[in-house]
């Protein structure tokens, strides 16, 4: 055994312990036919990334589950990796090029630019991996993957070709979401909708025959140069007679048809809708049904193109102002109304997204969605919490075709070649040398790359060796056991992994989707750069220790719900680490044994703690299995702090100081046994401190992290003894509280009289009253015995009436006078605060933190007054 230092210093322990695990391949997983498989694939963080609090929580949850299953005897694989993060990485490298060298990617050309990106990835891409290690991540780092490594690239190409051959990938002109800032297409899931104030402009379109006009309402007058029709509901009596006629498009003076379509809602707006098929997905569908012309007027960079007439070259929002002014001057603008509506924005740069007609590559979703819906509906895949099942199903039932092409250079280049002669598209697993249709040798490769999420969708099986179906890893660990992820990427990623797994593997990618919420600041706000409220997890880990941070992120955390991060809680969890450390040091300083074995004869307090531990083992295991990690951690915390440290250690001190060796060693064995089993339960949550303490205790095996998880054992269930000890603890707690209220020092010994029907229980507890309740003597009498209460204070518990002759220790009159004075002072302070809280001016002007502080002070004063009243009442009995 080694001696633990007086103070626990995580900075001195964590790096050394982690390296010890790495040196001994503790995280390495191998397919083992004698063990059950357990696997998690890490949601790959962006290669550009630095660890933020969301990563820290996500990683901690996965690590807890992996360590738990590893200790339960599973061959547990936690497979790490990073994502190439198309747009994010390209933007980073372009910024570096521009600021350091004054160059653009076009100055370098595609090949040289990609060389720069790979160099950047090699330099910075490992940063987040090292940060995860500091948090204690027990991944099998030897299997670390990258979404653009050779294996993943092969899987991407195979999937693309398979889906294309089945007709599930196609190229077509459709309305897509376009980011004019990032200059690329976005999938529906990459668009965030924000409620923005705007206007509704009512515009008059004159009828071609001069018989009047039709009025439309629009939020986007800048697109009207691309209008190719006006639609009305065929059942709308107001407009029926106009269907088939034409009207004149203001400003452009172009004749456009009026068509009848049920898409238009009677009574909504004016009932007439301008049709811009090139810039609105609904208009595009109406246009297909009525053969309307498609005229695009907004260019890729968000400016008006040559089809916009005199507005050519203007920014789209400048054009809006100009065209509204022209419409007003020419008499076409009827009225303007304020109007708040949802505007699509880019998830990365937050600029407004532009719906554009564009030739892009798409995945046909309807056939793929069917199986992806079935495996969730029939329970093959379970969501935790279950409420997210509905969210997932609803999205999958209404899913649109997925736009997978991106106008970037960094990413998986689409494996399609256009024949320069006949225009045929050649999609091949290997680079073709000639056109499969006409034999022409001149082929031009598609420049677009695939959406980053395309490769991420294959992650559960591409990382296991697919498309090699004989891969030992794939056979053993697929389907994976759990996917741990945030609710914000159910559509981006979870849904796509499910339909990809069902299509490529004919098997679900995971059994359970464990959803967690976001980590918010202490005011409940999302952490962001713009608010400046982000908290660096590595700073917290450096200051308080990784274990304290991990425990903070888990305790009180429930599946699917956001959590607020309080720095003060990190401090509290560091105090918890210190409590465990000090308790362990106390145990070790009293150890003379070098092997732990429970004694055959157990005392009352031994049976109590073993029974409590046994219940804890069952409750922690059950909650871990149910993914209620926050509940499990809270139960461990309460057991260690209350049952073990505050009570059991104190209850054993008499025996530890006994002259009898057997008595001493029996106490040591139980203390040590309970500590070791508790360290095992705590280990997945706090891996560093538990391993360090365990290594210093008598133990079997090399590492705590590879030791056997405790199991519930009926032979350690002692309900009668547990109840008896709890009765004694309740009595001691009540006595201490009353003595504290009356300012009786612990050094003052008291002769207690206990009136109870549980004489045996209290007789067995006499040594504990002596040590923990400052008893000089304990007299036990029947529950109905007549007690002379003169000069005594009575304390009642569920099992006894306890009388304390405190008159000889306390000057009641003097103490009552002191209490009355303290109460009067507290009441005066309380009245002042309550008056302030009734003042409307104070409530309107004071910062929220000040108001909350005043309310908290008022509650503290109320509690103090209540306590003083109780003390006075006790003395007056």
Regions found by a protein language model. Name each.
Residues 1-235, 259, 276-289, 293-308, ...:
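N-terminal, positively charged nucleic-acid-binding surface of large information/translation enzymes
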Residues 34-42, 64, 97-104, 129-136, ...:
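Active-site-adjacent bridging/hinge elements
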Residues 37-43, 49, 274, 424, ...:
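Short hydrophobic beta-strand segments
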Residues 54-66, 73, 82-83, 152-155, ...:
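Structured ligand/cofactor/substrate-binding pocket environments in proteins
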Residues 67-75, 96-106, 130, 134-139, ...:
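Secondary-structure transition/capping motifs at alpha-helix termini
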Residues 99-115, 382-383, 538, 559-571, ...:
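Short, polar/flexible loop-turn hinges at active-site or ligand-entry regions and domain interfaces
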Residues 182, 252, 349, 420-422, ...:
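Short Cys/His-rich metal-coordination motifs, predominantly Zn2+-binding knuckles/fingers
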Residues 202, 394-454, 458, 503-546, ...:
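Feature 926 captures the class I aminoacyl-tRNA synthetase adenylation module centered on the KMSKS loop
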């Amino acid at each position: 055994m080694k001696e633990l230092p007086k103070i626990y210093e995580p900075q001195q322990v964590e790096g050394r312990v982690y390296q010890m695990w790495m040196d001994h391949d503790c995280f390495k997983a191998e397919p083992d036919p004698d063990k059950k498989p357990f696997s998690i694939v890490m949601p790959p963080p962006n290669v550009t990334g630095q660890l933020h609090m969301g990563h820290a929580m996500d990683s901690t949850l996965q690590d807890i589950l992996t360590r738990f299953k590893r200790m339960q005897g599973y061959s547990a694989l936690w497979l790490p990796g990073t994502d190439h993060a198309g747009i994010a990485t390209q933007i980073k490298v372009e910024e570096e090029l521009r600021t350091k060298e004054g160059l653009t990617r076009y100055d370098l050309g595609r090949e040289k630019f990609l060389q720069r990106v790979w160099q950047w990835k090699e330099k910075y891409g490992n940063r987040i991996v090292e940060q995860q290690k500091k948090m204690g991540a027990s991944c099998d780092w030897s299997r670390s993957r990258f979404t653009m490594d050779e294996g993943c690239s092969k899987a991407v190409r195979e999937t693309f070709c398979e889906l294309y051959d089945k007709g599930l990938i196609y190229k077509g002109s459709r309305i897509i979401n376009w980011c004019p800032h990032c200059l690329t297409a976005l999938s529906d899931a990459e668009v965030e909708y924000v409620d923005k104030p705007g206007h509704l402009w009512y515009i008059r379109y004159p009828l071609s025959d001069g018989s009047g006009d039709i009025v439309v309402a629009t939020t986007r007058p800048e697109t009207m140069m691309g209008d190719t029709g006006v639609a009305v509901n065929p059942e709308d009596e107001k407009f029926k007679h106009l269907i088939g006629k034409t009207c004149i498009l203001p400003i452009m003076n172009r004749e456009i048809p009026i068509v009848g379509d049920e898409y238009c809602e009677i009574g909504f707006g004016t009932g007439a809708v301008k049709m811009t098929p090139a810039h609105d997905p609904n208009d595009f569908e109406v246009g297909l049904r009525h053969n309307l012309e498609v005229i695009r007027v907004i260019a890729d960079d968000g400016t008006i193109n040559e089809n916009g007439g005199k507005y050519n070259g203007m920014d789209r929002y400048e054009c809006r102002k100009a065209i509204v002014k022209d419409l007003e001057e020419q008499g076409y603008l009827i009225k303007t109304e304020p109007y708040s509506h949802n505007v699509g924005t880019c998830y990365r740069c937050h600029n407004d997204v532009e719906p554009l007609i564009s030739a892009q590559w798409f995945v046909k979703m309807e056939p793929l969605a069917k199986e992806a819906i079935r495996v969730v509906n029939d329970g093959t895949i379970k969501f935790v919490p279950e409420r997210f099942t509905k969210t997932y199903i609803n999205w999958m039932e209404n899913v649109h075709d997925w736009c997978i092409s991106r106008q970037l250079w960094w990413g998986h280049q689409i494996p399609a070649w256009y024949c320069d002669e006949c225009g045929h598209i050649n999609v091949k697993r290997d680079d073709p040398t000639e056109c499969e249709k006409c034999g022409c040798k001149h082929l031009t490769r598609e420049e677009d790359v695939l959406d980053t999420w395309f490769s991420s969708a294959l992650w559960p099986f591409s990382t296991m060796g697919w498309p090699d179906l004989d891969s030992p890893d794939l056979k053993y660990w697929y389907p994976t056991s759990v996917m741990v992820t945030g609710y914000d990427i159910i559509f981006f990623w979870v849904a796509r992994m499910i339909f990809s797994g069902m299509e490529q593997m004919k098997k679900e990618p995971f059994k359970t989707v464990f959803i967690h919420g976001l980590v918010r600041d202490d005011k409940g706000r999302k952490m962001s750069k713009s608010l400046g409220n982000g908290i660096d997890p590595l700073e917290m880990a450096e200051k308080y220790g990784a274990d304290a941070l991990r425990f903070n992120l888990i305790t009180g955390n429930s599946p699917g719900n956001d959590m607020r991060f309080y720095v003060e809680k990190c401090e509290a969890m560091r105090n918890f680490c210190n409590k465990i450390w000090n308790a362990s040091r106390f145990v070790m300083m009293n150890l003379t044994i070098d092997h732990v074995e429970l004694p055959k004869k157990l005392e009352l307090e031994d049976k109590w703690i073993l029974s409590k531990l046994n219940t804890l083992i069952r409750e922690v295991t059950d909650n871990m299995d149910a993914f209620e990690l926050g509940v499990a951690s809270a139960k461990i915390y309460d057991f260690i702090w209350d049952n073990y440290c505050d009570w059991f250690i104190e209850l054993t001190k008499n025996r530890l100081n006994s002259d009898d060796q057997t008595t001493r060693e029996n106490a040591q064995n139980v203390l040590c046994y309970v500590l070791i089993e508790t360290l095992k339960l705590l280990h997945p949550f706090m891996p560093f401190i538990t391993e360090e303490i365990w290594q210093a205790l008598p133990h079997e095996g090399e590492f705590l992290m590879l030791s056997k998880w405790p199991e519930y054992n009926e032979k350690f269930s002692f309900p009668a003894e547990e109840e008896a000890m709890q009765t004694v603890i309740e009595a001691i707690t009540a006595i201490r509280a009353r003595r504290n209220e009356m300012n009786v020092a612990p050094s003052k010994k008291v002769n207690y009289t206990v009136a109870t029907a549980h004489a045996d229980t209290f007789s067995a507890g006499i040594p504990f009253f002596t040590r923990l309740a400052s008893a000089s003597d304990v007299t036990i009498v029947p529950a109905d015995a007549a007690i002379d209460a003169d000069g005594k204070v009575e304390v009642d518990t569920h099992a006894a009436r306890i009388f304390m002759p405190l008159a000889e220790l306390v000057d009641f009159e003097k103490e009552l006078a002191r209490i009355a004075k303290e109460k009067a002072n507290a009441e005066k302070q309380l009245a002042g605060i309550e008056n302030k809280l009734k003042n409307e001016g104070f409530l309107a002007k004071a910062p929220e933190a000040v108001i909350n502080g005043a309310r908290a002070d008022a509650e503290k004063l109320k509690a103090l007054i209540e306590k003083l009243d109780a003390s006075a009442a006790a003395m007056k009995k």
